[in-house]
A protein has these predicted regions:
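FNR-like FAD-binding dehydrogenase module
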Residues: 1-83
Length: 83
């Protein structure tokens, strides 16, 4: 399960199912790949959810370049198509 929501200021809130036994501490990051945007590109993002949240991992990603702009456009079109 991956869910993305566009927020003001060109930010995407990305929520990913947390794998079993995945541990992290504040300040840790994960590499993200969205094949619909770029099949072989992985990008690092800081985890914004609390380690105590056991079911999902949250990321807040601001548009700063080509890939993050494509991410924003992808989830923006997903929101338009579901509304």
């Amino acid at each position: 399960m991956t869910m993305g929501v566009v927020l003001p200021s060109k930010v995407v809130s990305l929520v990913i199912r947390r794998p079993p036994h995945f541990t992290f501490k504040p300040g840790d990051y994960i590499f993200v790949n969205i094949p619909a945007i770029a099949t072989f590109e992985w990008h690092p993002f800081t985890i914004s959810s609390a380690p105590e949240q056991s079911d999902v991992i949250s990321l807040h990603i601001r548009v700063v370049g080509h890939w993050t702009n494509k991410l924003y456009e992808y989830f923006e079109s997903e929101q338009v198509n579901t509304n």
